[in-house]
Every structure is written in structure tokens, then in C-alpha cells.
Amino acid sequence: MTMLRKIIGWILLLCIIPLFAFTVIASGKEVKQMKSLDQVLDKNIDLKDISLVQNSYMYDRDGSLVSEIVSDHENRVLVPFNKIPEEVKQIFLTSEDRHFYEHKGFDFMGMVRATASNVKDKKIDQGASTITQQLSRNLYLSHERSFSRKLTELAYSYQLEKKYTKNEILEAYLNTIYFNNGVYGVGSAAQFYFSKPLKSLTVGEMAFICAIPNNPTLYDPLKHFDYTKSRQERLLKGLKDAGVITDKELKKAVKQKIKLDVEKREDKYPDYVSYVNDEFTQLVSESEGFDKRLQKASGKQKEKIENELSARVSTLMKDGVKIYTALDPYMQNQVVAQMNSKLPYADVQGGAAVINHQTHQIIALSGGKNYQKYDFNRAYQAYRQPGSSIKPLLDYGPYIEQTGATTSSTIDASKFCSKDYCPQNYNNRTYGTVTLDTAFKNSYNTPAIRMLDRVGIQKAFSYIEPYHFAKLVDSDYLLPAALGGFTNGMTPLEMTKAYTTFGNSGSYTPSHAITKVTDLKGKTLYKWNDKATQIFSVRTNMQLKKLMSSVVKSGTGKKAYFNAPYIGGKTGTSNDYHDMWFVGLTDTYTMGVWVGKDTPTSVEYLHSISPQLSIWKGTLQAAY
């Protein structure tokens, strides 16, 4: 009975089609007095502009492709109508819709033939769908085979024909049809199956990929190559019969050996790409005012704005954008290699960031040892206690700026207590009066506490406000912060960004991975627009660089030293050896390295080998 109802439905559909067609083309007085079909369809079927999901692209500093980003699992490279080879157009016209340029969205005689066949075979198999109907189905409807869906498809097809030219419909169709394996459109099919652009395919190769959409599962060349080849030959014969190619060209195309070269999609630099995706959201947020709205919002309102931002970013990615970055592939490979080779024990991890402080560009990132795509990225997601690496920013910098001290100025390094807070030097040692140079390169704690206490907590913290440490909270404004005691801490990237101040005469400009974002036609959509902030005077900055130079020459960071125009930095160790840091700079680069365990526990057993220092040295030495 079910099959009988379906067949009767098709017969009824055939009866309705003439009435439908008559209403479309009639101009009689009686019809004009009726409410027009156009008005009914316009009211009930709102055709949105054809907007196809497209791939987005990410490039390194030299313009080489780094990553192709597929949205909604639709791998699509949009090819304009005038760039689609004539052979491809003709293959689909001859095989799918010979009367495409003549009908108004549906082919009545074709449906008669299909219905007769369905009645004869007692099944709904042939639908005689035109290219316009197929496009309607791909864009707006399901692929269910039923009478009601078919009638709806006709209405949508009629609307499409009203709104778009035939060439626009054919272009959209050729960019929406499915080629299996997550591939949509003729452009992506050429790239996926042959690893070359559509225009570079031979006629035989074009016909081969064009064989797939008729039944993507059956004609999947990765699983059923012979089936695909057989259909390719039928399509080529159809081209010859239509006069598109000659008999000689047919024989040559059929004879050509098809060699698939399936595109290998791999992110060579997952650590860096992961961050760029995050920074892209930041860039959109700042450029379109989401950041200011988020600062004022809270609770459900904040969540709503965050969802709006996420939707906006998703839309941009679906529309297709080109993201240009400062990625230096050589330095990226260096930092990844160092991280993978210098961290012993399976549970020991790390994160690192490398910035060219002359250009304010993030050129390399390591998200961790043996980092894989979608892993937790420790370079920018791991908030850890910075230990003594905070001292140049929060203690020594403000103190020298406020007092006019120099590296040879002296300070008390004896015991210090403020109420119940009595910090100790390493190994509980006590010292007398020492120079700032001695205190800094040996990382004495009590002098740093005294500096913060002398300057004043509020005043000292004002020096680090321009860095916008994301998880700095009010409860951090206490003396323990002088030694890196924060509620949440900082990420390796945050610390590295802050240290670029020392490479720029005390001036700070935020560093970024993204240099610009354009649409697929090259129009610039977004660029960072940052302003410099003078954190320390040139004089203070010179003193700080001298102090940091002493660290690598004769202090706690000696293992990081190599021959370069300038090297300086600061080590850092948090309480109970949960975190080990080295953040430093050369004349060109600033780099920060953190080593520890994801679940904070002691790594004191690594103190003697100091992997954070060897990773830092191994990475930057390769640049000189």
C-alpha cells in the first residue's frame, strides 16, 4: 500500500504540474484577478541569498600556506562561473539537465518519463530533477524522496529561477554538489582527488571527478575506482555526442590513465595555528566592539555577547577569509624540536613563545612536548606562578624608576617580615647589604620584597597594568606578588610579551601573530591598531638590561648564555618547585619558557639540568 500511495502521489504531481506551469505563464484576465502565484510564493518562501560555506586560509610570514580551515565539515573552494572549464559545465548539462537553459526550473516532459519509469518499476527511483531542483534541494531542503518534498522543491526552483540568472544557478550548483569524503564543489574535488586546481585538470580527469556526484557513495574513487571510471567513460561519450569534444579527444581522454593524488591535510604547525585561531577571535572582538561590551557586561548578558562573538567569527570563517601571520617556520621547528628533546620524563611538560620584539610579532610557539592539534596549549592557556621572573617587571623596574637607583646601588638583603609574612631567601640563607646586581643575578628574595614595599603595592602594580595579564585579580595586590605569588599566574606568552618592553627602550607595544585578515578577494578586513606605552624610562630600561645580562653571564641563568650582541633574562621558580621559568631576550628576540607538570607538583629533581634554560638557548642560538 505504501508503494501504491507513492506512485499515486507521483501521478497526482503530474496532474498538478500543468496547472502550476499554467499559473506561471498565463496572462489571462481571470488569472490576473486571482492572487498571483508569485505573491503567494514570495510570502511563503523567503529565499536567502546563496551564500556557500567556503574554506579559509592561513599563511606564514612569507605568504606560504600554513593551514586550510574547513568550516561545518564542508571542504569547498568556490570557483567563479568564468573560471569553471566549459567541459565541466557541459558534462553536467548533458548528463543532468539537457534543457537547463530552456525550462523555468522544472522539466515537465522529463517528469513524465520519470513517473512512467517509477510506475513501471513500482519504486520511486527516477526523479528527473533539473539542475535548479537539485540546487534547491542542496540549499534549502532535505533529500527525502516524497510527493510533498517534490512539490516544495518545485516551488523553490521556480523562486530560484526568478531571482537568479541561469549562469548564477549553474555556478552555485557546481559549487554545492557533493563529491564524497567531505568535499563540496568542483574546485575542492579537483584539489582533493588530484592535488591541483580545476583549471589544470585534463578532460579525462574532469570527467572522472564529475562522475562522483550522481551517487557519491557508489562512485567514491577511493573505494570504487572501477565504478567511477566506467561512469567517467559514459560522461565522456555524452560530451562527444553533444559535439563538445571530437572522437579523437574522446579516445584520448578514455585512454588516459587516471592517477589519484589525494590531498594530504595536515597542520604542520598545530601549536601556532591553535593560537592564531584564538587571536582571530580577539581581533574581531576588538575591531567590532565586542570587547568593550564584554567589559561592561556580566552574567547572562555577558554569555549572550560571547555567543554573538562566536557566531560572528563562525560566519567570517564560513564566508572565507585569508589570515596572514608572522609565523617563522624555521624558528617554529626549532622551538618544537627543543621542547620535544629537552624535557625528560613523560609527565614533565612545557610551553614557550618567541617574539621578534623589533616588529612586535609572535613568530613561534610551543604548546607542549609532543603537542598535537586540539591539545591543551600551554603557550597561551597555562596560567602558572611566574616566580622570580616577575621581578624585573614588578619589583626592580618600578624601584629603579622611582628612586633613580643603579645596578651598583645597595639594598638590604637581610630577613624581612611584615606582620605574619616572612619570606625566605633560597635555602633560608641570610645576607647583609648587597648591590642590586648581586641581588638580581642570584635571585635573592628579601631585597625584591623591600623594593615592592618601598615603592608601594598600588604604585608598583600600575607598572604592569598595560600588560593586561588576563587573570590578575584584586587579591594579588599583596607583598607575595613580589616573588611571583599570584592567585592564578601568567602564561608563557603573557610573560614573553611583557618582556619585549626591555627590547624596546622601556616602551611596550602588544605583540601579535596575525598581521592582517582579508576576504578571499584580498580586501583587508582586520588589522591590529596598537599604540605604544612607555613603561620605564630609557635610563631605567638600560639598568634593567644590565641586571638581566648579569644573570646569564654569572648568575642563575648561565646555562642560557651563547654568543650574541646582547643576551639577558631572568629565571623563576615557584614555591615547592612547581614551576621553572626563564624569560629573556637577545638584540632581536624575546622568548619565554615554562617547565612543570600540568597538575602542579614538584620538579625539583630537574633543578640541576634546568631544561628551561637549555630550551631557550637551543631555540634562539639557531637564529644566530
UniProtKB/Swiss-Prot annotation:
GO cellular component: outer membrane-bounded periplasmic space; plasma membrane
Subcellular location per the Swiss-Prot or TrEMBL entry: Cell membrane
PTM per Swiss-Prot/TrEMBL: The N-terminus is blocked.
Gene3D superfamilies for the chain: Biosynthetic peptidoglycan transglycosylase-like, DD-peptidase/beta-lactamase superfamily
Cross-referenced InterPro entries: Beta-lactam/transpept-like, Glyco_trans_51, Glycosyltr_51/Transpeptidase, Lysozyme-like_dom_sf, PBP_transglycosylase, PCN-bd_Tpept
Catalytic activity: [GlcNAc-(1->4)-Mur2Ac(oyl-L-Ala-gamma-D-Glu-L-Lys-D-Ala-D-Ala)](n)-di-trans,octa-cis-undecaprenyl diphosphate + beta-D-GlcNAc-(1->4)-Mur2Ac(oyl-L-Ala-gamma-D-Glu-L-Lys-D-Ala-D-Ala)-di-trans,octa-cis-undecaprenyl diphosphate = [GlcNAc-(1->4)-Mur2Ac(oyl-L-Ala-gamma-D-Glu-L-Lys-D-Ala-D-Ala)](n+1)-di-trans,octa-cis-undecaprenyl diphosphate + di-trans,octa-cis-undecaprenyl diphosphate + H(+); Preferential cleavage: (Ac)2-L-Lys-D-Ala-|-D-Ala. Also transpeptidation of peptidyl-alanyl moieties that are N-acyl substituents of D-alanine
Chief location: membrane
Name of the molecule in the record: Penicillin-binding protein 4
Organism: Bacillus subtilis (strain 168)
